[in-house]
A protein has these predicted regions:
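N-terminal beta-strand motif that seeds the catalytic metal site of vicinal oxygen chelate
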Residues: 1-18, 68-70, 119-150, 178, ...
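Vicinal oxygen chelate
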Residues: 1-2, 81-132, 138-141, 210, ...
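Conserved active-site tyrosine of GNAT-family acetyltransferases
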Residues: 19-26, 84, 111, 149-156, ...
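Short secondary-structure junctions
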Residues: 28-35, 90-95, 158-164, 220-224
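Conserved short beta-strand elements that form part of the metal-binding/catalytic scaffold
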Residues: 30-65, 113-120, 160-194, 242-248
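Short hydrophobic/aromatic beta-strand element in the GNAT-like acyltransferase core
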Residues: 42, 103-105, 171, 200, ...
Length: 255
């Protein structure tokens, strides 16, 4: 199976209009997609889309993204933190300095976990990280058994393991988004998986990709759903993180 890219990160919301205003006016880190409607709103980061997913599309109650799930690059972390704090955004403690980067986790609207991030040190190979403000540096994928998770993301999904991964920090790459396998308990957080359909993997043929994953033991309780513009097939990784196969077959309207 070939994952072409991540089409979007699903951000669960209860009130779509309120969430739209929050992402536009409070966070002000991403560009609102002009194709958004009163039923589906998207914000474009530098490398990936964040889709605000109302409860109508995710029955079963509101489940927010867990702690520090969506990690967003900024140039001036202290300045951005001050700006957001003045707008009522709640940060978790004083943030951290890992020795190579600074981070400031915060709780976005509806309890969704996000984090401001700035890497200041070059990578081990000497390369300097370069990306604009608003780039999603990675999505933190909570795991309880890293070896099992590596077998799934590198084996079943066929993603490339980042060669800069270490014994304590492992990343897998799509063409546009990094997935970091993290054990939240090492940061004093409770393990909570990503809610349903949080990461939408673009594939050329949903039915074929689904069949291939089923041979690896992956289950698709909802089968394949036709939304009228795309085919989707929700599934979970071994830790219960909500993922999705996605293929849009309808033409994309011009902006």
């Amino acid at each position: 199976m070939i994952v072409e890219r991540v089409d979007f990160i699903g951000v669960p919301v209860r009130d779509l209009a309120e969430a739209d205003a929050y992402f536009r006016d409070t966070l002000a880190l991403f560009e609102r997609d002009p194709r958004s409607s009163d039923r589906w709103v998207e914000y474009d980061a530098a490398n990936v889309t964040l889709a605000l997913v109302p409860e109508a599309y995710k029955p079963g109650g509101h489940e927010p993204l867990p702690f520090a799930s969506v990690v967003v690059r900024v140039d001036d972390l202290d300045g951005e933190r001050s700006r957001l704090s003045e707008r009522g955004v709640e940060f978790a403690g004083d943030g951290f300095d890992s020795g190579v980067c600074n981070g400031a986790p915060f709780v976005a609207l509806e309890g969704n976990g996000m984090m401001l991030h700035r890497r200041y040190a070059p990578f081990a190979d000497g390369q300097v990280p370069e990306a604009p403000r608003g780039h999603v540096d990675f999505v933190a994928v909570p795991v309880q058994d890293r070896d099992r998770a590596e077998g799934f993301y590198g084996g079943a999904l066929g993603l490339e393991r980042n060669p800069r991964s270490t014994d304590t920090w492992v990343e897998y790459e799509t063409s546009n988004l990094t997935l970091a396998l993290v054990d939240p308990t090492t940061a004093g957080q409770e393990f909570k998986p990503l809610p349903g359909a949080s990461i939408a993997f673009r594939v050329a043929d949903v039915e074929a990709a689904k069949a291939e994953l089923e041979t690896a033991g992956v289950e698709f309780p909802a089968g394949i759903i036709d939304s009228g513009v795309c085919h989707i097939a929700p599934f979970s990784d071994p830790d219960g993180n909500g993922l999705m196969l996605h293929h849009r077959y309808a033409p994309v309207q011009e902006r």
